Amino acid sequence: MTIWNVAALTGLLSVGLGAYGSHGLQKRVQDPHLLKSWSTACTYLMFHSLATMAVSLHPVYGKSRWTGPLLITGSCLFSGTIYGLCLLPKGHSLRRILGPLTPIGGLVMLTGWATMLV
């Protein structure tokens, strides 16, 4: 699977999860903060999917072969942990694991962007 395919898959997921957030999530989650977090996760996943697609088409993509994988990994980790935190009930043991992973995903995304500077 190419980086383009992975980016297309994450873009597809962001649209589907965004639709679920708009039409079904309110039946399960009532906290407006969590609903906003879900929306933020969808936005970050979509923007980083598009950025990864653009990077994969860039003629000097090979110069920084880590950019695409870092953007995708970071956005999946960042957004994925937010989705989990929104869906898991308060007090669930996985919440203690997912919470600290969210900013790590953000740092991985930042690293991906930084690789484009060199």
UniProtKB/Swiss-Prot annotation:
Topology within the bilayer: Multi-pass membrane protein
A Pfam family: DUF423
Chain ranges on the Lumenal side, renumbered to this chain: 19-40, 89-96
Entry's Gene Ontology cellular component terms: endoplasmic reticulum; endoplasmic reticulum membrane; membrane
Position of the signal peptide: 1-18
Transmembrane segments: 41-61, 68-88, 97-117
Cytoplasmic side: 62-67, 118
PANTHER family with a match to the protein in the record: TRANSMEMBRANE PROTEIN 256
Family under the similarity heading: Belongs to the UPF0382 family.
Name of the featured protein: UPF0382 membrane protein C1782.12c
